[in-house]
Amino acid sequence: MLGPTWEPLAPTSMLGLEGPCWVGPGPDGGFAVSEEFGDVQLFGSAHQPLGSLGTLTGHNFGHPAGVCSDAEGSIIVADEQRHQVTLFPRVGPPICLQLEGLKRPLGMACAPQGQLVVADAGDNCIKLYQYLGEMA
């Protein structure tokens, strides 16, 4: 037996997405969805659309993949095509995190003490980076 049956909380459709690929937690109880065609859509805790990171910040993505948010409410996006990870703080411009050795970043998660765990499909491995507290 695998466990209890999972049922949807509410039958909700997020319309207007173009090739949704990855879903991750967003700030304030919301979530973020990366789209196959080059943007990341943000949704609030009541599932209401908040806009796209590209439109809100002027950032151009190659192929956004994994998304997550950190303890400070920043959204972090892996860009598979550009081989980079970008941090979108609550206030201010996007910051390209200088993470050495990324070949094809896909999934990621924020870990305790300001660490970022990245699944790098180009190297077939998981990479751990320290990013909070290390930026000047």
Curated annotation (Swiss-Prot):
Residue ranges that the Swiss-Prot or TrEMBL entry lists as coiled coil: none
Alphabetical list of PANTHER family matching this protein: E3 UBIQUITIN-PROTEIN LIGASE TRIM32 (PTHR25464:SF3), TRIPARTITE MOTIF-CONTAINING PROTEIN 2-LIKE PROTEIN (PTHR25464)
Keyword match Secreted: no
Residues spanning the signal sequence: none
InterPro entries reported for this sequence: 6-blade_b-propeller_TolB-like, NHL_repeat
One of the Pfam families matching this protein, by short name: NHL
Each NHL repeat, start to end: 48-91, 93-132
Keywords of the record: Repeat
Gene name in the database record: Nhlrc4
Name under which the protein is recorded: NHL-repeat-containing protein 4
Species of the source: Mus musculus
UniProt xrefs under PROSITE patterns: NHL (PS51125)
